[in-house]
């Protein structure tokens, strides 16, 4: 319960501050757990600052009070509209990358090293084996489609440190009437704990098929992977989960992996399972996530070349948004005590004393690491300003030169499109819908984008 509670509170107050979500009432026991977790998180955050020799961080952007001195910026003229970005096709020795071989053998490893060291952290080389167990199978219906639902647990080998146990939770759903292995869209999901209220539904919203039903209508399957069964979404949990298991319950080093990288690692372990399941076409596995899980989806796609496609929804700072943009959520927010656990400790340096101009990489290079595989970047409008749709578009557009080097197509434009314009003719797609902080309105466009790859 503690993990779920912290995720929900952080999401409501940090990730999408302009949304009218209801904060569920907590019991006194839950209040006590929350306070203890926050205290432990602050202590871990302070310990990392001490390790880095940082006395203080710059103030975070305030997305809740537009009159605050540190109010989040939503003025394009003040957003660094023409950022100077690190060159994606120039080696560190200054030589230009002109061939696919040079990109794959030389430049790509340079970029990965920078992201490992400074942004997302390094995955240990000796990560343990995961043994997947099917703990239940259910034949049922989703709408009018008969489905087979497998409930799975991925048991992480903890023989090196039995004090910490990690079981990765996932469900896999495939059409019962499929005559051959099917593509699968994998989502970083979230389950509301019993007793917690979901956000109120919009009574004026039209009732559309769920994304799962839309996927099934194409003959595909879907999987829901619970990231918090891999690693907690708070700083207090960094000595637990897969990160804690690898560190034997000790604190992180400055370049150790954060939660985003850990969740992405878990997605790769799910893909390991898909490669063994006769119902699944393991060459056609997509990864999708929204908000913080959109960040994780992009990281998973960038690091694991087995993922065929990704839908990155409202990922914002730390995801597809350019770090070198002052719009909505910024580096200082992600380096703060509510979000720092997503990243390597080293990332905190760029919120004090360093700045975004000191970063060796930016998010256009993260998108470029996915090439030549297709990436779809989505965002909303009102209620989703925090994630900087334009900054994410700019990153996708700037990655295009790598796609073109590898014989594919980028977005095809550097001009930010009008609202609800679908850019899906290239291998980097983009759409900003008119809704808020939700992936739902972009699912039909993503599916249209994905069809040409899942044929």
Language-model-derived ranges and their functions:
Residues 122-184:
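N-terminal cap/lid segment of alpha/beta-hydrolase-fold proteins
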Residues 180-281, 316-325:
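Cap/lid segment of the alpha/beta-hydrolase catalytic domain
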Residues 309-366, 388, 392-413:
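Mobile cap/lid helix-loop segments that gate and shape the active-site cleft of serine hydrolases
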Residues 342, 390, 396-455:
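C-terminal catalytic histidine-bearing segment of alpha/beta-hydrolase fold enzymes
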Residues 371-389, 433-435:
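Conserved strand-to-loop "acid loop" that flanks and positions the catalytic carboxylate
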């Amino acid at each position: 319960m503690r993990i779920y509670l912290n995720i929900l509170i952080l999401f409501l107050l940090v990730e999408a501050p302009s949304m009218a979500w209801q904060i569920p009432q907590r019991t006194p026991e839950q209040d006590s757990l929350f306070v203890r977790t926050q205290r432990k998180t602050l202590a871990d955050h302070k310990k990392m600052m001490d390790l880095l020799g940082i006395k203080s961080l710059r103030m975070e952007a305030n997305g809740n009070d537009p009159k605050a001195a540190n109010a989040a910026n939503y003025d394009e003229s003040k957003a660094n509209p023409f950022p100077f970005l690190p060159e994606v096709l120039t080696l560190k020795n200054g030589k230009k990358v002109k061939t696919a071989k040079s990109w794959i053998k030389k430049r790509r490893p340079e970029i990965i090293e920078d992201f490992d060291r400074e942004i997302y952290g390094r995955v240990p080389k000796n990560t343990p084996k995961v043994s997947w167990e099917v703990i239940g199978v259910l034949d049922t219906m989703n709408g009018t489609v008969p489905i087979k639902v497998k409930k799975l647990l991925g048991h992480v080998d903890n023989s090196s440190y039995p004090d910490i146990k990690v079981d990765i939770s996932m469900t896999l759903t495939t059409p019962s009437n499929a005559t051959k292995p099917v593509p699968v869209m994998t989502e970083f999901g979230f389950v509301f704990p019993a007793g917690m209220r979901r956000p109120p539904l919009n009574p004026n919203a039209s009732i559309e098929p769920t994304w799962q039903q839309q996927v099934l209508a194409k003959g595909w399957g879907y999987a829901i992977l619970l990231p918090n069964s891999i690693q907690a979404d708070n700083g207090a949990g960094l000595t637990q989960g897969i990160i804690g298991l690898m560190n034997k319950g000790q604190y992180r080093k400055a370049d150790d992996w954060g939660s985003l990288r850990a969740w992405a690692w878990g997605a790769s372990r799910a893909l390991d399972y898909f490669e063994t399941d006769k119902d699944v076409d393991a060459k056609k596995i997509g990864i999708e996530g929204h908000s913080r899980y959109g960040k994780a989806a992009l990281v998973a796609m960038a690091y694991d070349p087995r993922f065929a496609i990704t839908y990155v929804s409202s990922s914002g700072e730390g995801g597809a948004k350019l770090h070198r943009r002052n719009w909505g959520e910024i580096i200082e927010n992600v380096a703060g005590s509510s979000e720092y656990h997503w990243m390597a400790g080293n990332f905190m340096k760029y919120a004090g004393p360093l700045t975004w101009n000191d970063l060796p990489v930016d998010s256009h290079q993260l998108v470029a690491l996915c090439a030549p595989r297709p990436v779809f970047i989505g965002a909303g409008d009102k209620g989703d300003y925090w994630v900087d749709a334009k900054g994410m578009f700019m990153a996708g557009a700037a990655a295009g030169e790598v796609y073109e080097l590898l014989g594919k197509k980028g977005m095809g434009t550097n001009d930010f499109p009008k609202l609800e314009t679908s850019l899906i003719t290239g291998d980097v797609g983009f759409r900003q819908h008119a809704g808020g902080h939700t992936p739902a309105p972009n699912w039909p466009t993503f599916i249209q984008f994905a069809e040409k790859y899942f044929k």
